[in-house]
C-alpha cells in the first residue's frame, strides 16, 4: 500500500472490541499527509462511531488525537443498510454478539464474500440462525465465520459472544455457501489443535454441499472461478 499520501481506501469495522480496532492509528498509509480513509461501522448506544473512536485514539491511551494524524479519517455509521463503495456492493446486517455488531456481505465482479467475524450462537447450543445472518451468507462464494470454540469449550464459555466450529459449518450449509473459512481462532489453540479442528470441520461438512473448508490465516489467498 502506498505511504506517500496517495492512499485512498475504505475499511469495514464489525464492532468496537479492542482486537478489531486498536490497529487503526498504526495503519501506516494513513500516517502520510494527503491520505484518506473512510471507516464504516455500527453506531453505539452511547454515540456515533466517530465519537467512540475519538474516545480512545487520544491521550493518555494514544500519543495524539485522530485530528493530529497526517492523513484524514472519516467515520460513517452503517447498520442494516446497503451501500456501494468504489463499485463494490456492501451489505451490512446486525449479527448477534456482545454489543453493537455488524456482519458484512461484499459483492464485486460476480463474486460474493460474507464476513461474520464474531457471532454468538444460541447459548443453549441449538443451531438456529437469524434471518439477517442467512441473508448475508446466502449462496456466498466464501463465508468467513467465527469458529472460536470446540463443543467442550463452548459449554464453559457459552456467553462469550462466539460459536463452535460445528455451528459455523451449519450456518454455511443453511445458507448454501460454497466455501467456509474458519475465523477468530482461540488464542489457546496451537497448530496441532487447529489441524484437528479443521479436520473435524471438514468431516462435518462432507455431506453438506460445501466445496471447501479452510482455517483462515494471515496471508491466505483464495481465488474464485469465473
Can you annotate each of these PLM segments?
Residues 1-114, 124, 133-134, 194-226:
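Binuclear metal-dependent hydrolase catalytic cores
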Residues 15, 118, 184:
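Active-site glycine-centered loops adjacent to acidic/histidine catalytic or metal-binding residues
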Residues 78-79, 117-119, 146-147:
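Fold-independent oxyanion-binding glycine-rich loops
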Residues 113-120, 154:
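Short, basic, glycine/proline-bearing loop/turn elements
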Residues 122-212, 216-217:
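Cap/insert and terminal regions of metallo-dependent hydrolase folds
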Amino acid at each position: 500500500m502506498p505511504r506517500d499520501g496517495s492512499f485512498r481506501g475504505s475499511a469495514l469495522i464489525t464492532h468496537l472490541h479492542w482486537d478489531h480496532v486498536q490497529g487503526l492509528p498504526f495503519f501506516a498509509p494513513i500516517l502520510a499527509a494527503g491520505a484518506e480513509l473512510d471507516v464504516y461501522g455500527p453506531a453505539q448506544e452511547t454515540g456515533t462511531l466517530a465519537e467512540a473512536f475519538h474516545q480512545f485514539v487520544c491521550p493518555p491511551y494514544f500519543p495524539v488525537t485522530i485530528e493530529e494524524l497526517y492523513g484524514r479519517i472519516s467515520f460513517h455509521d452503517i447498520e442494516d443498510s446497503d451501500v456501494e463503495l468504489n463499485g463494490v456492493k456492501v451489505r451490512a446486517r446486525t449479527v448477534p454478539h456482545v454489543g453493537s455488531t455488524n456482519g458484512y456481505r461484499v459483492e464485486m465482479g460476480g463474486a460474493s464474500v460474507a464476513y461474520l467475524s464474531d457471532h454468538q450462537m444460541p447459548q443453549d447450543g441449538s443451531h438456529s440462525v437469524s434471518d439477517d445472518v442467512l441473508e448475508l451468507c446466502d449462496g456466498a462464494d466464501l463465508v468467513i465465520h467465527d469458529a472460536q470454540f470446540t463443543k467442550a469449550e463452548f459449554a464453559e464459555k457459552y456467553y462469550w459472544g462466539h460459536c463452535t466450529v460445528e455451528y459455523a459449518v451449519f450456518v454455511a450449509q443453511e445458507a448454501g455457501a460454497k466455501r467456509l473459512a474458519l475465523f477468530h481462532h482461540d488464542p489457546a489453540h496451537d497448530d496441532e489443535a487447529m489441524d484437528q479442528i479443521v479436520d473435524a470441520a471438514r468431516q462435518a461438512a462432507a455431506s453438506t454441499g460445501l466445496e471447501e473448508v479452510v482455517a483462515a490465516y494471515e496471508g491466505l489467498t483464495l481465488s474464485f472461478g469465473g
